[in-house]
């Protein structure tokens, strides 16, 4: 039961393009020998055979992850494009979610240490909280007229920046 809960937590944590991009960067650094394998991936320091097997899997997995995340970027832009019909936008989001799940399975296969992903998750949480704050400010028309408050355009700009950064909307991060 505990292991299943842990797996569910990791899956939920990884199932965003923001964290998948971070996981990809970590795997690229291991592949390029900028980060130590045994400090980034859960593997015994003394298990040379397992280390070798992981290094052989990293190259194709990184290539596949890059491809999936590139496609996700295009589908994300389609899904938030209000000029497209809702049917196309929903189809793009559905494809994005399917690819995210494939990417999560690839990252899980590599067994990255949760401690390496936790800082990224905290950044995502802060971005999510800020999106909620910005939406609340935009909804409160009275506060927008007070001196020193950002303009509607500035707030919308910040919200769109955070959405492009995380490939999420405030609603999808709830």
How would you name each of these model-derived features?
Residues 1-174:
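Transcription initiation cofactors for RNA polymerase, centered on bacterial
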């Amino acid at each position: 039961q505990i292991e299943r809960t842990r797996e569910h937590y990791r899956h939920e944590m990884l199932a965003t393009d923001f964290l998948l991009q971070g996981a990809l960067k970590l795997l690229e650094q291991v592949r390029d020998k900028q980060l130590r394998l045994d400090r980034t991936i859960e593997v015994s320091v003394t298990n040379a055979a397992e280390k070798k097997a992981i290094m052989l899997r990293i190259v194709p997995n990184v290539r596949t992850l890059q491809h999936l995340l590139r496609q996700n970027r295009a589908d994300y832009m389609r899904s938030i494009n209000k000029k497209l019909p809702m049917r196309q936008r929903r189809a793009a989001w559905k494809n994005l979610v399917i690819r995210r799940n494939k990417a999560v399975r690839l990252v899980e296969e590599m067994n990255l240490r949760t401690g390496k992903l936790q800082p990224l998750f905290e950044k995502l949480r802060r971005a999510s909280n800020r999106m909620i704050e910005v939406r609340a400010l935009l909804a409160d028309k009275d506060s927008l007229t007070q001196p020193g408050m950002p303009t509607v355009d500035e707030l919308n700009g910040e919200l769109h920046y955070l959405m492009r950064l995380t490939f999420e909307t405030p609603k999808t991060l709830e």
